[in-house]
Amino acid sequence: MTTSAQSVLELLPAVDIVDGQAVRLLQGEAGSETSYGTPLEAALNWQNDGAEWVHMVDLDAAFGRGNNAALISDVVSQLNVKVELSGGLRDDESLERALELGVARVNLGTAALENPEWTRKAIDRFGDKIAVGLDVRGTTLAGRGWTKEGGDLWEVLARLEDAGCARYVVTDVTKDGTLQGPNVELLRQMVEKTGKPVVASGGISSLEDLRVLRELVPLGVEGAIVGKALYAGAFTLPEALDVAGRR
């Protein structure tokens, strides 16, 4: 890999799904949805604008009220980009179903906190197709739709490192959907404690935020999930890709 390639911040525009619609939540709270049309329209929009990844979240599955698996399967089949899927992956059945949809990677959230032995086996079985989403409030992890505490971040990280986790998606839940800027200090602490790639999520509001995150790429920040700022028109995806070094 060349030096220039190493300085590229991978962008993952988000498509959050509730009841078959693409939505954005404020700080992950059910009932705070703003609708943005169909998931396929949203994902194709990002693909056409130059994305190589889409971060898709089945919020119904995350909140334990059914799932959008059939819809997601249809969307993935019509895309040429890689899809990272999150939401409601808590057992072998849901994990296998998600991977069978054709996604490139899945994010384990609550299950990684509540069932560490199952998580270890999933990582052993599927390797770098598994990322673990760490949703953080201070240094306390939030579980199950961000409504319950899930333990100390550094204790859980040590356990996941021991299990061989390949990648972490780190969200400061106090920032998510707020356009208040990412938690750079949290990301710095994360990359200091793991040699694995870290994907940043939550709070990205401006091209300047992306410039700051790109400076962390040599330290181990691999990418950034961008949601509300794109939907709200703070910047376009092509503009963001320019700043991230991809175009």
Swiss-Prot record:
Keywords: Amino-acid biosynthesis, Cytoplasm, Histidine biosynthesis, Isomerase
Catalytic activity: 1-(5-phospho-beta-D-ribosyl)-5-[(5-phospho-beta-D-ribosylamino)methylideneamino]imidazole-4-carboxamide = 5-[(5-phospho-1-deoxy-D-ribulos-1-ylimino)methylamino]-1-(5-phospho-beta-D-ribosyl)imidazole-4-carboxamide
Pfam families associated with the record: His_biosynth (PF00977)
GO terms assigned for molecular function: 1-(5-phosphoribosyl)-5-[(5-phosphoribosylamino)methylideneamino]imidazole-4-carboxamide isomerase activity; phosphoribosylanthranilate isomerase activity
Predominant subcellular localization, coarse grouping: cytoplasm
Catalytic class of the enzyme: isomerase
Pathway: Amino-acid biosynthesis; L-histidine biosynthesis; L-histidine from 5-phospho-alpha-D-ribose 1-diphosphate: step 4/9
Enzyme Commission number(s): 5.3.1.16
Localization: Cytoplasm
SUPFAM superfamilies the UniProt entry points to: Ribulose-phoshate binding barrel
BP-aspect Gene Ontology terms: L-histidine biosynthetic process; L-tryptophan biosynthetic process
Listed GO CC annotations: cytoplasm
Catalytic machinery residues: 16, 135
NCBIfam families (UniProt xref): hisA-trpF (TIGR01919)
Family stated for the protein in its record: Belongs to the HisA/HisF family.
Protein name in the entry: 1-(5-phosphoribosyl)-5-[(5-phosphoribosylamino)methylideneamino] imidazole-4-carboxamide isomerase
This protein's encoding gene: hisA
